Amino acid sequence: MGKRLISQNRGRGTPKYRSPSHKRKGEVKYRSYDEMEKVGKVLGTVIDVLHDPGRSAPVAKVRFANGEERLVLIPEGISVGEQIECGISAEIKPGNVLPLGEIPEGIPVYNIETIPGDGGKLVRAGGCYAHVVAHDIGKTIVKLPSGYAKVLNPACRATIGVVAGGGRKEKPFVKAGKKHHSLSAKAVAWPKVRGVAMNAVDHPYGGGRHQHLGKPSSVSRNTSPGRKVGHIASRRTGRK
């Protein structure tokens, strides 16, 4: 009897395939959307900048005027001791948080909410930013890094600027060990071995005197889990 496929082991949910979220610094999101932000602004001071394992951007610990502390994504150019503003009357300056409806067109933004008050869901990776493209009655159009223009509620909040940590991909890993330690902070099994390079006991495409599939690559949607590899329920394969 053959061994279980990687996809089957992943479904079991062993520690190897689970994200080590216990190593993270904490929840990174905006403060609650209260009346102070809806009618004015709240001041906060950056008291520390932290490395968060598994995240591509640094996070800052911010202490607000009411004593509340939050972990937030910081933009390029912000350092310890600087002040940020959150609210409808905040200044248009990197690091400040405003509703999309109050941000002028063409300004780069990140950590965008999809529902007002959800804490920020879009554009959170290091070096990323979106652009406010247009405003209309009851909606704001934002161009995401993918090029997709998304229509959002003008009350959704966003941060002015570009997420810190850009250019991280320009430096090569050089050593396999560095890559291993980097991906061990995420739910990524690395290195990724091809099925044809495995033994017959490990994968349906494994074994043989040379690397080849040895069977059709298309499989049914209802195929048993141990054989469900390749093109699953494909309408067509190969070049068009």
Swiss-Prot record:
Gene3D superfamilies registered for this protein in UniProt: 2.30.30.30, Nucleic acid-binding proteins (2.40.50.140), Ribosomal protein L2, domain 3 (4.10.950.10)
Biased composition (Polar residues): 1-11
GO biological process: cytoplasmic translation
Annotated segments matching region Disordered: 1-26, 206-240
Single GO molecular function: structural constituent of ribosome
SMART domains: Ribosomal_L2, Ribosomal_L2_C
Ribonucleoprotein among keywords: yes
Keywords: Ribonucleoprotein, Ribosomal protein, RNA-binding, rRNA-binding
GO cellular component, one term: cytosolic large ribosomal subunit
Record field: compositional bias (Basic residues): 13-26, 228-240
Alphabetized InterPro entries for the sequence: NA-bd_OB-fold, Rib_uL2_dom2, Ribosomal_uL2, Ribosomal_uL2_arc_euk, Ribosomal_uL2_C, Ribosomal_uL2_CS, Ribosomal_uL2_dom3, Ribosomal_uL2_RNA-bd_dom
Family label: Belongs to the universal ribosomal protein uL2 family.
Summary of the function given for this chain in its UniProt record: One of the primary rRNA binding proteins. Required for association of the 30S and 50S subunits to form the 70S ribosome, for tRNA binding and peptide bond formation. It has been suggested to have peptidyltransferase activity; this is somewhat controversial. Makes several contacts with the 16S rRNA in the 70S ribosome.
Oligomer and partners: Part of the 50S ribosomal subunit. Forms a bridge to the 30S subunit in the 70S ribosome.
This protein's name: Large ribosomal subunit protein uL2
Biological source species: Methanococcus vannielii (strain ATCC 35089 / DSM 1224 / JCM 13029 / OCM 148 / SB)
Gene behind the chain: rpl2
